């Protein structure tokens, strides 16, 4: 029954946006503002996805973002799989991104620590979670699209880069985590 309520509410929002033309207008505005820059389009859609995903459950976030934002990414030339994974990923990142950070606040409550500090710590430790969607949007071989050699090369180099970046951000080699 919970899923029916979520899907019904998302359907009402999406239906309203489609009837008023705002869904199509958002796609056009995103493409117009970004111009020919895929990176600017990805940054704008990431911010919008995090904002729209705050406080919403997974299914509702995906339905909303797949209707509003994914068409702009597909129109810009990003593969449909990468576009939908990008919006889904950033919609879910709203759960650990302050100020809402529902998952971080729940973990802080269990651990008995300050929710705000837990949210910022989750953002700092999980920095690579904000980078990975850009990687697979720009290089779909991370989503197993393409030849086996390109997939292996991309996964290997991305893994090494994320490991090195995480060690640098967290400071694991110089201090204990």
Spans of model-derived segments:
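Hydrophobic residues within the alpha-helical transmembrane core of Major Facilitator Superfamily
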Residues: 13, 47, 93, 131-134, ...
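Hydrophobic transmembrane alpha-helices that form the pore/transport pathway of multi-pass ion
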Residues: 58-93, 100-117
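Hydrophobic transmembrane alpha-helical segments of multi-pass transport and channel proteins
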Residues: 51, 55-56, 72-75, 92-99, ...
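Membrane-interface helix termini and inter-helical loops of multi-pass transporters
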Residues: 17-33, 140-150
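C-terminal accessory/binding modules appended to enzymatic or scaffolding proteins
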Residues: 161-177
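Transmembrane helix-loop boundary segments of multi-pass membrane transporters
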Residues: 86-89, 115-129, 136-160
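Core transmembrane alpha-helical segments of multi-pass membrane transporters/permeases
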Residues: 1-22, 38, 42-51, 55, ...
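Alpha-helical transmembrane segments of multi-pass membrane proteins
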Residues: 38-52, 77-93, 117-128
